[in-house]
């Protein structure tokens, strides 16, 4: 027995409209003309609007003299019947265009048009003209109904309850909200621009498994599944990192993947359990070079897609043009917490006292590195408005990053924050197999101590490192959050076509 999404409750007045439309569909079925599929579209509304935008050049006389005939199709978004002549507006993927309909030209099709509803999908063929108000219009010579819409489109699309409905019924949102369509068009352009940027620099796009025998590559709780034929428990990947670094071992020295990750965590305006990441690795690069790369790819993507490096995001004006600030984590913590000394930053007991004073709840198992991170997240993170790289994280919270040569207990790692939100994470990769094995073992102990997000021990990855991995820099950029930044969206749900929602009651 298969599970089904419960049918949403339909208001009584909407029920009557649906019944009326079903009756119209029944009549079409009786005529044998329901849902035809033989119309060939040749033109798009947006292209016509752009080509004939100059009203001074393309007067009604000039348009008609051109002899231009168009074949278009789209959704009926408005209609105004005025006896022997009517106006309508259709929408396709590129925009909208007005139709001018005349009864003496269309005959029976005009009579049929009077019974069509907003939301129906229609085809039109005809010449071009311009109305007295200057609006470009298709002067219909032929008109057909291609798809009968059974549900009425919403008259209003705002307010809290409707925002949730937009997420649940994105198909309706895309029909009636041009701004939503523009966000997802920009999302596609952003990903395309990033791919082009990396491809131009000899990075190789690869695909790695989505189901893992051992979850790894990030400290996160995984989703579990089961392979029936092999009788084997598997995990949806939390990150592709360990597979991508295996490829670096194999000699693919510049690799990247743009794909889904899955983390069994909470849902918020910043988090969705399924999300898109760009992850890349470059042999013979340090975390300083990867910071340079991160800064440049974000800046160039903004310029390519938006034509500017200045954006507004959640009430803040962000400038991506200047060099991004680089700030050690311990220095940032001390700057915002003058009571914390340099010596305190690596003193577990001192940091515990500061956490208690700051009312930060911590677990008894936390060492100084985790405590320092907790203080950073509570007191510093939200203050980082302009692009800032926070660098040199403690080893305890960076199990895959290379240890610092000059600062014991710290790593060659960075995170990028913009307007208080993390957008990227990268580091010089740990390529010492013995050090990595010891850190995996520490993660196993943390998991045994109740940390659901701690990593497992991946013996095959250790074996790969034992063959030798070149000094390597790695990077992960959250695509969803980058799209939020470049589209000014305040919720991750606004940049996901189908965000996760609780099932409807």
Curated annotation (Swiss-Prot):
The protein's Enzyme Commission number: 6.1.1.6
Catalytic activity annotation: tRNA(Lys) + L-lysine + ATP = L-lysyl-tRNA(Lys) + AMP + diphosphate
One term of GO molecular function: tRNA binding
Gene3D superfamilies per the UniProt record, alphabetical: Bira Bifunctional Protein, Domain 2, Nucleic acid-binding proteins
Record-linked Pfam families: tRNA-synt_2, tRNA_anti-codon
Keyword ATP-binding: yes
Ligand binding (Mg(2+) 1): 415, 422
Cofactor note: Binds 3 Mg(2+) ions per subunit.
The protein's required cofactors: Mg(2+)
One of the record's GO cellular component terms: cytosol
Sorted UniProt keywords: Aminoacyl-tRNA synthetase, ATP-binding, Cytoplasm, Ligase, Magnesium, Metal-binding, Nucleotide-binding, Protein biosynthesis
Residues the entry annotates as binding Mg(2+) 2: 422
Annotated InterPro entries: Aa-tRNA-synt_II, aa-tRNA-synth_II, aa-tRNA-synth_II/BPL/LPL, Lys-tRNA-ligase_II, Lys-tRNA-ligase_II_N, Lys-tRNA-synth_II_C, NA-bd_OB-fold, NA-bd_OB_tRNA
Enzyme superclass (EC): ligase
GO biological process: lysyl-tRNA aminoacylation
Location(s), subcellular: Cytoplasm
ATP-binding as UniProt keyword: yes
UniProt-listed NCBIfam families: lysS_bact, PRK00484.1
Recorded family membership: Belongs to the class-II aminoacyl-tRNA synthetase family.
PANTHER family: LYSINE--TRNA LIGASE, CHLOROPLASTIC_MITOCHONDRIAL, LYSYL-TRNA SYNTHETASE
Subunit and partners: Homodimer.
Protein name according to UniProt: Lysine--tRNA ligase
């Amino acid at each position: 027995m298969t599970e089904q999404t419960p049918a949403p409750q339909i208001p009584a007045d909407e029920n009557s409209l649906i019944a009326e439309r079903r009756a119209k569909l029944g009549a079409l079925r009786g005529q044998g003309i329901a849902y035809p599929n033989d119309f060939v579209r040749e033109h798009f509304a947006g292209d016509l609007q752009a080509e004939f935008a100059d009203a001074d050049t393309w007067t009604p006389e000039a348009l008609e003299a051109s002899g231009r005939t168009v074949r278009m199709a789209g959704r009926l978004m408005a209609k105004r019947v005025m006896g022997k002549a009517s106006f309508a507006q259709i929408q396709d993927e590129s925009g909208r265009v007005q139709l001018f309909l005349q009864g003496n030209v269309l005959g029976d099709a005009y009579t049929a048009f009077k019974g069509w509803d907003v939301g129906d999908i229609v085809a039109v063929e005809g010449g071009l003209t311009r109305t007295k108000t200057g609006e470009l219009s298709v002067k219909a010579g032929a008109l057909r109904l291609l798809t009968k819409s059974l549900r009425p489109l919403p008259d209003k699309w705002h307010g809290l309850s409707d925002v949730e409905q937009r997420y649940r019924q994105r198909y309706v949102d895309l029909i009636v909200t041009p701004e939503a369509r523009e966000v997802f068009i920009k999302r596609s352009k952003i990903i395309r621009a990033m791919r082009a940027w990396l491809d131009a620099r000899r990075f190789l796009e690869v695909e790695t498994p989505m189901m893992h025998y051992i979850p790894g590559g990030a400290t996160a709780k995984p989703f579990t599944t089961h392979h029936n034929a092999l009788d084997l428990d598997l995990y949806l990947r939390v990150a592709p990192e360990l597979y991508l670094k295996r490829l670096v071992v194999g000699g693919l020295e510049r690799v990247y993947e743009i794909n889904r990750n899955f983390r069994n965590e909470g849902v918020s305006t910043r988090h969705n359990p399924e999300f898109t990441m760009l992850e890349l690795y470059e042999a013979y690069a340090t975390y300083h070079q990867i910071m340079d790369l991160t800064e440049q790819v974000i800046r160039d993507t903004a310029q390519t897609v938006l034509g500017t490096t200045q954006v507004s995001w959640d009430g803040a004006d962000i400038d991506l043009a200047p060099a991004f600030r680089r700030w050690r984590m311990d220095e940032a913590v001390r700057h915002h917490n003058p009571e914390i000394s340099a010596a305190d930053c690596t003193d577990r007991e001192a940091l515990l006292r500061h956490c208690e004073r700051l009312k930060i709840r911590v677990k008894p198992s936390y060492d100084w590195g985790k405590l320092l991170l907790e203080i950073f997240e509570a007191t510093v993170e939200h203050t980082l408005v302009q692009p800032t790289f926070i660098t040199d994280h403690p080893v305890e919270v960076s199990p895959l990053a290379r240890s610092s040569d000059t600062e014991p207990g710290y790593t060659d790692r960075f995170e990028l924050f913009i307007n208080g939100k993390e957008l990227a994470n990268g580091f010089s990769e740990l390529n010492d197999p013995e050090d990595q094995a010891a850190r995996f073992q520490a993660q196993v102990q943390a998991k045994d101590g109740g940390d659901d997000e701690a990593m497992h021990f991946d013996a095959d990855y250790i074996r790969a490192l034992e063959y030798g991995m070149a000094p390597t820099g790695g990077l992960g950029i959250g695509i969803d959050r980058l799209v939020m930044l470049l589209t000014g969206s305040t919720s991750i749900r606004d940049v996901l076509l189908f965000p996760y929602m609780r099932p409807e009651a």
